[in-house]
Amino acid sequence: MNFLIASHRSKKLAWFFASCHYLCSEFIPFMQKLLFLPILCIVLLTGTVQAQSGKIEYQPDWESLNSRPYPQWFRDAKLGIFIHWSLSSVPAWSGKEQYGEWFLRGLMVGDTARINFQKRVFGENFTYEDYAPLFKGELFNADEWAGLFARSGARYVLLVSKHHDGYCLWPSKYAPGWNTMDVGPHRDIVGELSKAVREKGMKMGLYYSLPEWNNKLYRWGTDKPDMVTRYVDEHMIPQFKELISTYKPSLIFSDGEWDHPATTWHSAELIAWYYNLVGDEAIVNDRWGGGADYGYRTPEYSSGLSMSERPWAEVRGLGRSFGLNRNESLEAYMTPQDLVHFFVKSVANGGGITINVGPYADGQIPLLQQERLLQLGGWLKVNGEAIYGSTMYAKATEEKDVKFTRIDPEINFDWVRNSPGKPVTEDNFTATWTGYIQPRFTDNYLFEAQADDGIRLWIDNKLVINKWNADATGTQSNVMEAGKSIAKEGHIILEAGKKYEIKVEYFETQQNAHAYLWWSSANQAKEIVPVSCLFANLQSAKGNGLYAVYKSKATRLCYTVNNGNIYAISLEWPADNNLVLNMKMPAAGTKISLLGRPGNLPWRYENGKVIVDLSPVKIVELPCEWAWVFKVKK
C-alpha cells in the first residue's frame, strides 16, 4: 500500500502544458501563441501558489514530522476528559488494582477472578461476544455529557473509539456486527459526541487501539508477532483512515503499540496523512511503536513529569481504572483535594491532565465521577487565569517531606502505579519494614525478594539480600502486563521458635511498583513470609506483621506564569498565616492578591523570601477549597 503523498501540482502542470501546446498548435496563429502561452503559465502558477499558500504538506518521515510545531491550543488547554465506554462496561468488574477495560484479556489468559465472576453473574456458557446486545446505552445523551465536560473546565474531550477488544463506537464497515450501529445502542456514538462537544466550544479527540486481542487476522498477545502484517494492511490502516476522515478529530491518541516498532504500524505515514488532512490544529500522542520518539507525552498513573520540551498530559482515571470497575473501593477514588492538587502540580510542571470517566453500560456517568468533575470546574472558575495558557515559572514547585506508618501483615504488594497510601506519592517513595521473624523449623532458609525497584533484607543484622538498583522503565502504556522483576535470593540458618531482628528496605522510582518476600527450606514449603511468623515488636505474643514507614516528597506550593504575572498556588493554608514564597525581590509597586477575593494583601521581603501576610483574610472570604492562588502582579 502506497502511503507517499502525491504531488498533484506537477501532474496538473504537465497536463495543462500539454493541453495548451495542442490547442495553440492547432487553432492559434504563431504570433498569438507566443503571447498567449506565457500569460496562461503565469495565471496557472499564480493560482497553484495561492492554492498551496499557508498549507504545508508533511512527508511520511520523522524528520518532516519533527519540523512541525505542536499546536498552541493543546499547550494552553491543560484539561481534557478521557472516556472509556465499551462492552467491558457491562460486566464493569476486575481486580481492585486492575483496569476494567481489560476484562476480555483476563478471560483470554485464564484470570480465574474474572472468569468466575462472568460465570456466576452471566452464566456458565456466556462469552464476551454476548455482552454486545447488553451494551444498550439507553441513557446516553451526548449533549448532557458535553455539558458536564464543559462545566468541568475541560478544553478537549478524548473518546475511546475502539479499545483492544475491537468493538467500535462508530459504524465501521471494517467491523461488521461489532460496532454500536449494528449491535448494542444502534447509534453512532462517535458522531453524536463529536457534534455535541464541538458545539460547546471544546476540541474533539479520538483514542484508537492499533492492535486487537481478538481479530481473526491477528490476535494480539496470542498469535506470533510476525503475523501482524496482514492485519495492519487489510484492517487497521483502512479502518483508521475511515475513522479519521469521517470525524476529523483535533487529537489522536493511539495505544497498544508496545510489541512492535513504528514501522510495523506505518506510524509516520499515518501521522503525516492525518496532519495533511486536518491541518494545523491536529496533534497526536506518543504511542506509535518502537523507534517513534514523537508526539505529546502521556505518562499514565504516575506522579507526572518534571520537565519536557514536548507538551504532555498525565492520563489516569478518577479511581484505579479507566473503564468502570464496580469492584473498586471508595478509598480508591480521588478526593476533590487529590484531584485539584494532582491537576495543579501537572500544570506547574508544564503539562496538564486528561482525567478519565467510565460510564455505566446504560450511558450514565456515575454520580461520584460527575461530582468530582464539577468540583474541579468550580475551582477553575475562581482560579482559571493561573491555569489556562500558563507557562512554567523558574521554580515550578516547592516540596516537603511526608510519611505515614502502619503495621503490614506481610510484604506482598503489587501497587501497580498507585501510591501505597496518602500522603506518599505514586513514584519516588521508600518503605522500611522492621520487627522480628520467628521460623517454624531449624533449617537453612532460602529467602527470595522480588521488587520494582530496589530491595534489601537484613536478618539478625546480616545482609541476606541486596538488590539496590532501579529497574529499567517500560512504556507508559503497558501497565496491566508489565513484566515482574527478577527475584534475588539469599540463605541464612535459623532456629525454630527463636525471634530474629528483621529489616527490609525498599525504594520505587517510576511506573510500576511491587515488593514480595518469600521463604522456603527443606521443611518449609515456599510461601510469602506469613503474618503468623512476623512481629512488630518483642512484646507481641502473636504474629501481627512488621512496622512499616513509608516516605516521599510532597508538593506544598506550585507556580505558574501568565500574561507577565506570577501565580503562587498553595496546596495548604499556612498555619501561621504567613505565606512564604522563594522568589526574587519583586519590583516596586508589585501587588499580591488572593484570586476570588477583592483587595490586595500586605507583603514584605526578608532573607531572599517574599512573605505574604494572610491574617486579613477571613474564613468567610475564602473563595474556594483545596488550593489557593495568589497573584503576584507587576
Residue ranges and their predicted role:
Residues 1-53:
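Bacterial Sec-dependent N-terminal signal peptides
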